[in-house]
Design a protein with these regions (language model features):
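Hydrophobic alpha-helical segments at protein termini of multi-pass membrane proteins
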Residues: 1-163
Length: 163
């Protein structure tokens, strides 16, 4: 029962993330030249995305990792961690600017310090969800699932920087 509830929560968060990530493309607010720039930038990003996915697929076959766990990790990394990290970074930035003086060390380096504190636990959550839904035991499998969740987050982050 708890596994089904977790799966439904994952699907809900992934649906929200898919809507959040594609909203700027589907709203019709961009000009034709902006869509052209987005298309060209996407083609450039595919130069590392496709080899990365093929490498994960190759290592998954070689190390006998269940493909479903890699799919969960990739979807979690792409559609869940990205939009939550965006909101969490905004909230943490607002908190730091409201509660700390501009002379404090943490205030000055907030951009460099808060992003890892917010984003890394979210990548860990995508990893933990994937291995909870499809249990894996060997260290090679766990490493590949973690790499896949990180690759998914990187894809999401690069797609957001284009728009």
């Amino acid at each position: 029962m708890f596994r089904k509830l977790t799966l439904y929560l994952f699907l809900l968060l992934a649906s929200i993330g898919l809507t959040y990530d594609t909203q700027s493309y589907t709203s019709g607010a961009l000009s034709g030249s902006a869509y052209g720039i987005i298309g060209l930038s996407t083609l450039i990003a595919l130069c590392y995305i496709l080899p990365g996915i093929f490498l994960v697929r190759y290592l998954g076959k070689r190390w006998q990792v269940k493909p479903l766990v890699l799919i969960f990790a990739l979807i979690g990394g792409v559609f869940i961690t990205g939009w939550i990290a965006g909101y969490a970074n905004t909230i943490s930035h607002d908190w730091v600017t409201a509660h700390l003086s501009s002379k404090s060390f943490f205030y000055r380096f907030e951009d460099a310090l808060m992003a890892p504190l917010v984003e890394e636990p979210l990548k860990l959550a995508a990893f933990l969800f994937a291995i909870y839904m499809v249990p894996t035991k060997s260290y090679k499998e766990l490493l590949l699932v973690a790499i896949t969740a990180g690759l998914g987050f990187q894809i999401s982050e690069d797609r957001k920087s284009v728009v």
